[in-house]
């Protein structure tokens, strides 16, 4: 699975950790790597981290797997989202989805989380502390993005989910199969499935703090706040073979 129209160098220069980018189906040929039944099957297994977010009268509720087979049969018409972490460790086709993103150093790769949502399903407005490529595998999803958030951003009083108390979208897009939305760390976002059969692959890239990178050099240094920032720039290690062309934005 490879890109057909995408320039890694221009992306790293203009968008990486700076601003979101919508990439309309850049693949040579897009094929959804995993069927919904396969994802549901993983959510039944011990040792696989899975969650179920259900919309109800009282708001969003979160359940942790492994789940019984009858749990999905009892969901009915209520909007819901199933999320399974690190699917790349369990399915070779999903693991192959990482390969086109190897222009980013491998040590930054976190995992590929896969979600399946019914019509109206989502996990609510939130932000993450990592770079992520949201690959629409099947179906459609509306994504909205807002301002940058941080430790002081107000959150709703929810026991299980870190949901933003305030979310004013500044841009929105509808993604279809094969489309990709890149989001930098800290950017508020909200995704809602349009219709059933919505599958999204979240290819996440963490940025270790300097304190993590030098942890082996001694505890006192690692605890120094001046080394706790996330400041490693992937553009510094960009292979020379990439040229400076403009990204395909659709």
Can you describe what each PLM-predicted range is?
Residues 1-14, 28-179, 187-238, 244:
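Active-site region of the double-stranded beta-helix
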Residues 242-250:
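Intrinsically disordered terminal extensions flanking catalytic oxygenase cores
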